[in-house]
Amino acid sequence: ELPVAFDALTVVINPQNTWARTLTVAELKKMWEPGAQGRITNWKQIRASFPNEKLMLFGPGADSGTFDYFTEAVNGKAKSTRGDYTASEDDNTLVQGVENNKGALGYFGYAYYAAHKDKMAAVAVDAGKGPVGPSLENVTNASYSPLSRPLFVYVRDTSAQRPEVKEFVQFILSRGDLVSEVGYLPLPKTAYALTLKHFQDGKLGSVFGGVPKIGITIDQLLAMEAKL
């Protein structure tokens, strides 16, 4: 289990939407929970001060890890969500849906928001301590919760001794600077050094088993990985 980056799941709206630049986790749940299906269809139902505007939702399909993490973080259970939204595994389809509909709201990884900032606005999410937007700083200081998540590379123990696998792992853990180039958020250098040492020492096991803990911080991640 090799932690390589953090991602900030980003809730986005159409640029013409001037009323929902901040939303609480409870309001997101009100939109996305299973009981909202066929019932919550207007922005005014989310907050009384919002306009009478049709709510249109866009998000990844059920086979996506982003879907699993978002539904657990917001609704309390992975894969628990309303079904009457526009789902796609192609993030470009989601971008276009939000871009072309004033009342749209969607979510995906930070990379797609960063690549299309001119077409949409990011929502600052309030988990109880005030609204916080997605950024490297806010993921690093643990204030962007619960929508920040660690990303991992998993290596089979029987493959770890192959020269090309060793070379690949050495490369990805020594070039954390490349992480930001593809829209993800790099870990501290100490994290990459610790992970590389674990790999070189042949430490096996997984803290998360492929399912990261909701709301975990970088410091918590490092502490847990250090115990492997």
Model-based region annotation:
Residues E1-L228:
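Flexible loop/hinge segments at secondary-structure junctions
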